[in-house]
Regions:
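Hydrophobic alpha-helical and helix-loop surface patches within well-folded domains
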Residues: 1-128, 181
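Structural detector for internal amphipathic alpha-helices that build alpha-solenoid repeat scaffolds
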Residues: 189-191, 213-227, 235
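Amphipathic alpha-helical scaffolding segments comprising HEAT/armadillo-like alpha-solenoid repeats
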Residues: 96, 195-206, 227-234
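Beta-strand-rich binding/interaction modules
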Residues: 95-96, 106-184
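Extracellular/luminal regions of secreted and cell-surface proteins that mediate adhesion/ECM remodeling
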Residues: 113-115, 191, 203-204, 216
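Short acidic/polar inter-strand loop motif in beta-rich domains
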Residues: 185-195
Length: 235
């Protein structure tokens, strides 16, 4: 839980700077002064992307790549591509698209999300719209895996993974009617989202959720409603 709270704080610091001051790629050669690089993009923003990279390749391969990078380039001038190649050597993956999207491009995913449940078909329908696209700022669509967590009426927790590749995407997941649903229960992805699957489900998540991400999502969305019952649940 402590790590997840830290990740939430780091995401907030980075997103706050990107929304309220400026947005830039993590890796860039455009700056007025080198000190300008030591900002919320570089540290919390960069840390979050390394966290996602570790999730992608796995702990053992990630740290083996880091060790090769340190041992090979200690006391030498390096480029970000050197680090990328070390991780690729141990993961066996081509990471060009990941680094291009998350390190060499601007912004982060901003999702407008909704949920409906079809009792007859036993399907949960999730709609995701990426709203961060801004051609003037050079912010484009992202491709990302996103975990969806849900709890059934018996109290059992489930996690499904969806892959977002389009501006607007509908995903159907076979499930029993959930007591609550949430996005990214294990704090694996960097994004900002609006997601209210229903006030009753949010209150259930607030009371019975088991993750930091779930608690934060429930509190945030309930507060947005301004309803007395929901505000009382938060207190």
């Amino acid at each position: 839980d402590a790590m997840h709270w830290q990740l939430a704080e780091e995401a907030s610091s980075y997103i706050g700077e990107a929304k309220n001051r400026y947005v830039r790629p993590i890796i860039t050669r455009e700056y007025d002064h080198s000190w300008n690089m030591f900002d919320m993009h570089l540290y919390p923003g960069g840390a979050w992307r390394l966290h996602m990279l570790r999730q992608l390749v796995g702990d053992d391969k990630f740290w083996a790549g880091v060790q090769e990078y340190v041992n090979t380039y200690a006391a030498r001038t390096v480029k970000s591509l050197d680090f990328q190649r070390c991780i690729e050597n141990h993961s066996g993956l081509n990471l060009d698209s990941f680094f291009d999207m998350w390190f060499r491009s601007k912004g982060y995913p901003i999702l407008k999300s909704s949920f409906e449940y079809d009792k007859k078909k036993g399907l949960g329908k999730f709609t995701f719209e990426q709203t961060q696209v801004d051609t003037e700022k050079g912010i484009e669509l992202f491709e990302m895996g996103l975990e969806i967590g849900w709890q059934d009426a018996r109290g059992a927790d489930h996690v499904d993974t969806v892959h977002l590749t389009k501006g607007t995407q509908i995903v159907n997941i076979k499930m029993d009617e959930p007591a609550h649903v949430m996005l990214d229960p294990n704090m694996k992805s960097l994004f900002e989202a609006e997601f209210n699957p229903g006030d009753d489900k949010l209150r259930h998540l607030l009371e019975h959720g088991k993750t930091v991400r779930g608690l934060m999502q429930a509190m945030s969305e309930l507060a947005k409603t301004g309803k007395r019952k929901n505000l009382k649940a938060i207190r």
